[in-house]
Amino acid sequence: MPTKFRIYTETFYNKTNAQRLPVMLYLTLSLVLAIVSTLSLNNKKQKKTRLVSSVLTWVMLIHTTLLLALRWYVSGHLPMSNGYETMQFMAWATLIVTLVMQKRFLPVKQFGPLLSSFALLVAMITDGNPQITQLMPVLQSPLLSVHVMVIMFSYALFGLTALIGLQGLIAHHRKQEEKEQQLAALSQFLLFPAVALIAIGIFIGAIWANVSWGRYWSWDSKETWALITMLIYSAPLHADIKWLRKAQHMHIYMLLAFLSVLMTYFGVNYFLSGMHSYA
């Protein structure tokens, strides 16, 4: 029997998590901030948007941390078992990346809350706060939780490179060559930890698969697309690809490359079948 405190906690969580207003408010504010930051050349406006962006990032982080912690306590396991929980974690991971990098990289500060808001919106729309249930025995391994967390951090970084790519194309259109070059360099810098994380995530997933299913790799749909995604994002790290040396081409590549992430996370679940169909 659950304790009274656990019942109270679950009731509080259900009431808190069911509110859609905060998500829509986060999305609206972060979208406005991203647009103003991208288009404004006024230093005073830039300072104001940076301040508001910092406050919004902290508010969102506290909120998502609370939701994840409550769901963890109520369920008794790390909230990494379905699409709703992983998108919430991606929102949280994006905010962590934003706070770590915002002092040195302004575009991350500008787009972090927006990407996090989109992740929360997708979580709200797709699964809509699914019922908390016990995990199947095969999903109770700590390796699986670590695998998912590492992969979602890499997706957060890939998402940021896509938004930076969009800003880079806007800078190209506005003839801001220096800014365009800086954004391309930032995207390439972010690719190093992002590709490393997805590679580590795939490796940990293979170890878990061997423990659970008796084989490291089965060419499952999601495994295959995760590998494809890693290879696609690895390409810009090779200096001998001349086409990607041009900033505009780099930004276009980052936008198109994110389609592989969308296919890996969403497309596989809806259009293909495999052992990851529950994810």
Where are each of the predicted segments found?
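Polytopic transmembrane helical bundles with strong interfacial aromatic enrichment
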Residues: M1-A279
